[in-house]
A protein has these predicted regions:
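Phosphate/nucleotide-binding catalytic core
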Residues: 1-151
């Protein structure tokens, strides 16, 4: 687990992308570069020169388009979890929040997974999937973004 590499996409509302990028840049003591484009990207380098992004996510229901926010992390490792936690706490204290339309995506490096380990993981998730959906109370209209394994 401690050597596993992963990336996270965290959707949120409550602050603008500009404000979110400023919070991330201030956290790392850097600035941000506005990339623009369809996702209206703002790129922020951390002390390890990795790029964190604040982008637009049109699937998010927000008061204003500029509040459809998603934080995209660079590739992280276990030792980065405390940094991520502190950054998210800072963002929350400054107004970032989630609503029913916000999601979280975790991408895991599959390099060290054997074919059997992948089968085991999918089987485990599949066998507990209904419990997860019920526990999370996922609304039916959100299912297009969060489909079940067998759908």
């Amino acid at each position: 687990m401690k050597r596993l590499k992963f990336g996270i996409e965290i959707e949120f509302i409550g602050i603008t992308r500009e404000a979110a990028a400023t919070i991330v840049a201030d956290f790392f003591g850097t600035g941000f570069f506005y990339e623009g484009g369809e996702l209206k990207e703002r790129d922020i380098a951390d002390e390890k020169h990795r790029i964190w992004r604040v982008v637009r996510d049109a699937s998010i229901e927000a008061f204003a388009e500029e509040e459809q926010c998603e934080l995209v992390t660079p590739i992280l490792q276990y030792e980065d979890l405390e940094c991520l936690k502190q950054l998210l706490q800072n963002m929350q204290q400054l107004g970032a929040r989630v609503n029913r339309s916000c999601g979280l995506h975790i991408h895991v490096d599959g390099k060290n997974f054997t074919p059997q380990a992948i089968v085991n993981l999918v089987t485990l998730i599949g066998s507990r999937e209904l419990l997860l959906y019920k526990a999370l109370s996922i609304p039916k209209d959100r299912m297009k973004y969060c489909k079940r394994i067998n759908d």
